[in-house]
A protein has these predicted regions:
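Phosphate/pyrophosphate-binding loops at sites that engage ATP/ADP/AMP, CoA/4′-phosphopantetheine
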Residues: 49-62, 133-138, 184-194
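Short, charged, surface-exposed secondary-structure boundary motifs
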Residues: 39, 96-99, 174, 210
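Residue-level signal for inorganic ion chemistry
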Residues: 24, 63, 90, 130, ...
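Short beta-strand-loop/turn "lid" adjacent to the catalytic site in phosphate-handling enzymes
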Residues: 57-89, 113-123, 148, 152-176, ...
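Active-site core segments that coordinate phosphate-bearing ligands/cofactors
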Residues: 5-6, 94, 101-114, 122, ...
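Short, intrinsically disordered, charge-balanced linker/junction segments flanking boundaries
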Residues: 30-34, 201-211, 320-322
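Acidic, glycine-rich active-site loops and adjacent beta-strand->loop/helix elements
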Residues: 10, 36, 69, 76, ...
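N-terminal glycine/serine-rich phosphate-binding loop of ATP-dependent small-molecule kinases
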Residues: 1-84, 112, 212-218
Length: 322
């Protein structure tokens, strides 16, 4: 039996699944929580990884990490974080996003360059926020990683150069999604100086090895991982309700929507993942269930029993900004 270890480093926790590679049977699983909030010390993810993989790692022949998208992990000369990570759902960078879009020539030009119109969640927007509000910190940044990159580095042998994949990279705002390559000029424009970016490992490649010699795969972002894991095919639509709400599909051609309604990501293979999202999802359902005094299953039943438009009731679900 060949066992592989899948890691989900999400907003709220690290989950580890030990799986039989032949048929997908889950052999064992563990999890460990992450700190709350939208600004956290990324080193806590490494501690959660160590906790969640205890007793599983030594049984696996290969490892892959999926992670929350967009988060800014800014490293200094020593390879350590210069500040806490700003997560995807930290919306303080909304003004910075609008500024960057203007500097790129407007929404259409921005979407043509990187596949998406930048919003607060994108990594580039967070870089500009740090530049504007913490210039001394910005000056210390030498390399920028995403959460999944940072955890993958930890899973690899000491000294391994950081790596990412095209799917997660497409959510930064400085990756040309259609061409499949970094735009280091856009990262420098956001931060104010040149910065090192991780190697983009090809899909299906051996990105690295662990200290014990286990294969470490490129991994990907959480939305790309979900589409891959569910075997999404052209014509399928995936709807996911978690901390965020997402509807996505896979296509063979890139998307560049200048209205900003559709985000034009790459997927975890050689295709693309057009996606619409909200940062307000499960919290809205949980709040409405509490307000009505019912559980989530009953809330779903009530929604199905209603009519489109809910008899004219309108809810603006922007509890955490957007």
């Amino acid at each position: 039996m060949t066992l592989v270890l899948g890691i989900d480093s999400s907003t709220q926790s690290t989950k580890a699944l030990l799986v039989d590679a032949a048929d997908g049977t889950v052999v064992a699983s563990r999890s460990a929580p992450h700190p709350p909030g939208t600004e956290v010390d990324p080193r806590t993810w490494l501690a959660a990884y160590d906790d969640a993989t205890e007793g599983l790692l030594e049984r696996a022949e290969a490892i892959a990490v999926g992670g929350q998208q967009h988060g800014l992990v800014a490293l200094g000369d020593d390879g350590e974080p210069v500040r806490d990570a700003l997560l995807w759902n930290d919306t303080r960078s909304a003004d910075a996003a609008r500024t960057l879009v203007d500097e790129m020539g407007g929404p259409d030009a921005c979407a043509a360059a990187v596949g998406s119109v930048l919003v607060a969640s994108f990594t580039a927007s967070k870089l500009r926020w740090v530049r504007d509000h913490e210039p001394e910190t910005a000056a210390r940044v030498r390399q920028v990683l995403l959460p999944h990159d940072y955890v993958s580095r930890h899973a690899s042998a000491p000294g391994t150069a950081p790596f990412t994949d095209r799917g997660d990279a497409s959510g930064t705002g400085y990756f040309a999604t259609a061409a499949g390559e970094w735009r280091p000029d856009l990262a420098a424009a956001a931060l104010g100086h040149d910065v090192a970016l991780p190697r983009v490992a090809p899909a299906g490649s051996v990105a690295a090895h662990s200290a014990a010699g286990r294969v470490v795969a490129p991994g990907t972002g959480d939305n790309m991982g979900a589409a891959l894991g569910l075997g999404l095919l052209p014509g399928d639509v995936l709807v996911s309700i978690g901390t965020s709400g997402v509807a996505s599909a896979v296509t063979a051609t890139p998307v560049a929507d200048g209205t900003g309604s559709v985000t034009g990501f790459a997927d975890a293979q050689d295709g693309f993942l057009p996606l619409v999202a909200t940062v307000n999802a499960a919290r809205i359902l949980a709040h409405q269930a509490r307000w009505l005094g019912v559980d989530l299953d009953t809330l779903s039943d009530l929604a199905l029993a209603s009519v489109p438009g809910a008899h004219g009731v309108t809810l603006l679900p922007y509890y955490g900004g957007e």
